[in-house]
Amino acid sequence: FMWLSNSSIGRKVVMSVTGIALVLFLTFHMAMNLVALVSANGYNMVCEFLGANWYALVATVGLAALFIIHIIYAFWLTMQNRKARGNERYAVVDKPKTVEWASQNMLVLGIIVIVGLGLHLVNFWAKMQLPELMHNMGVHTDMLTLSYAANGVYHIQNTFSNPVFVVLYLVWLGALWFHLTHGFWSSMQSLGWNNKVWINRWKCISNIYSTIVVVCFALVVVVFFIKSLMCSGAC
């Protein structure tokens, strides 16, 4: 398995596999968030099911590992590519028309996604699963915070009633869209679907999938923000 870290192809394979796994998680998370638009009780039931249970903790640790590996390999490959280009990267040249904007800016987009992820963890994970986990470990936990841990809808309402968070989340989702549109088909290319016919198909699928996911996430943000405006002073 040393080739996964010692060779450029191996690193790209690791990036691709971890990226696809994260895409699957995004799909699940998107579906879960859409439940909040239909049923507050249903969403809170899902949140309670995904609390500090052993299977949820295993999934959280696995997910964190995927993110960390994906991020490390992303920076590793970027530094490797820059080193390979040497002084050529400073030369002023016309960008090839076949090279997408997202491809040229994947590192910057990735950094925005990481910052957005940190914001998301602070607004949700740190207020939901973390208090339950600390309580189960015997660490003193504020009971009011603990009582709201499984109330996911409350945290969504509280976060997206703030216009600053709404704007930050929409910017984050925009960066995520660009990151996904390139990253998804690029992963498939690295895993062997690199002939012209399949690449074009994967690019189309990537654009459709990325748009659906980002629009659904953005829909939750916008709907709850509009609800907060409608309920202002009356709810």
Q: What does each model-identified segment do?
A:
Residues 1-235:
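Membrane-embedded alpha-helical bundles that constitute the cytochrome b-like, heme-associated redox core
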